[in-house]
Regions:
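Alpha/beta-hydrolase-fold enzymes
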Residues: 111, 118, 122-205
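Conserved alpha/beta-hydrolase "acid-adjacent" motif
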Residues: 240-246
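Catalytic active-site module of serine/aspartate enzymes centered on a nucleophile-bearing elbow/loop
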Residues: 260-313
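Catalytic histidine neighborhood in serine/cysteine hydrolases
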Residues: 58-60, 247-248, 252-270
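Active-site nucleophile elbow and catalytic-triad environment of alpha/beta-hydrolase enzymes
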Residues: 16-19, 205-223
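Catalytic nucleophile-loop/oxyanion-hole region of alpha/beta-hydrolase
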Residues: 70-105
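Short beta-strand/loop motif that positions the catalytic acidic residue
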Residues: 227, 233-235, 239
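Short, surface-exposed "cap/lid" segments of acyl-processing enzymes
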Residues: 12-70
Length: 313
């Protein structure tokens, strides 16, 4: 990641017709998945279609507030707006799960995982399980620039309004083919064009948005003991943005007695689209099946230890 300094001309919001991925199926639970910061529902597409086709689950992948809008609009997003956006989507999914009389499983990638943990703590009676995919509590991956450590200081200065990280290879992906497609798209992007994102997300990350993410993370850490439902954690050993420390921290601090930690060997941060996306989808499907069995009374809570073998199961 490289740092770019610029004043991005404000532009009005645009009408977003693509509100996310919404798949119908008659299965035994409702699944809601949330994308990451500056990402899009597209990064969850493979997992969503797998769960619909293999698990026969209805899947909801909403677009978080201001994602898909011009960069100047996205940069003004507060952490409260992000959480309220997730909560609004959650309420819709909860209503559907109640209407179907089936459990609700929620999950997310990176920021999406943080939001889902917060929802699970606030609505313990409504969340049957949480899947955390590359959860982000610490930006400590091997590709995070040293200047990222200055964000806590920049949060108290006007500098945060003019600083942007430009996304660089590997873009959170070990898959070289997909990485090449993203590079071709991002190379066409200029920070001063201030255009809306493509289905591949934004080429620039507003530092101000990272500052807001810090506030979400601090709140998420505080509520971890209140998360009592089953939790699945999946992370890559070589995650370029967030090290395995993130999943281990959650594993060690959540209140749930049913928790499982899966480590992947051939992926980077965006595990939902990378080389082991099929493995991730299979683990999430199995997790949903376990949640359904627990509700039916045929499977009691089991505490799972963190083992590398899980990744190859």
């Amino acid at each position: 990641m490289a740092v770019e300094w610029a004043w991005v001309k404000p532009v009005p919001p645009v009408d977003i017709t693509d509100c996310g991925i919404f798949l119908e199926a008659p299965g035994g639970c409702v699944v809601m998945l949330l994308h990451g910061l500056t990402g899009s529902p597209t990064e969850l597409g493979y997992i969503a279609y797998h769960l619909q086709y293999r698990g026969r689950y209805p899947v909801r992948c909403p677009r978080l507030v201001n994602h898909g809008q011009p960069l100047s609009v996205l940069a003004q997003t507060s952490w409260q707006q992000l959480y309220d956006s997730a909560k609004e989507a959650f309420m819709d999914a909860r209503q559907e799960s109640r209407a179907r009389n089936v459990p609700l499983v929620i999950g997310g990638l990176s920021l999406g995982a943080v939001l889902c943990l917060m929802l699970a703590a606030e609505f313990p009676e409504d969340v049957a399980g949480v899947a955390c995919l590359s959860p982000t509590l610490f930006y400590d991956g091997w590709n995070v620039p040293w200047v990222h450590k200055l964000i806590p200081l920049m949060d108290f200065t006007p500098l945060k309004y003019f600083a942007y990280f430009r996304e660089d290879e590997p873009f959170g992906l070990r898959d070289e083919v997909l990485r090449g497609k993203i590079a071709a798209q991002y190379n066409k992007s200029s920070i001063h064009e201030s255009g809306h994102s493509s289905s591949l997300g934004y080429a620039h990350f507003p530092v101000r948005l990272f500052c807001e993410m810090r506030h979400l993370i601090s709140r998420c850490k505080r509520i971890l003991p209140d998360v009592a439902c089953p939790v699945l954690l999946v992370q890559a050993e070589h995650d370029d943005m967030t090290s395995p420390r993130n999943s281990q921290y959650i594993f060690d601090h959540i209140g749930s007695t049913w928790r499982e930690l899966v480590m992947l060997k051939e992926s980077y941060h965006v595990i939902t689209a990378d080389l082991e996306r099929a493995t991730v989808a299979a683990h999430l499907q199995r997790f949903c099946e376990s949640v359904i069995e627990m509700r039916d009374g045929s499977l009691g809570p089991v505490a799972e230890d963190a083992t590398e073998a899980e990744a190859n199961a």
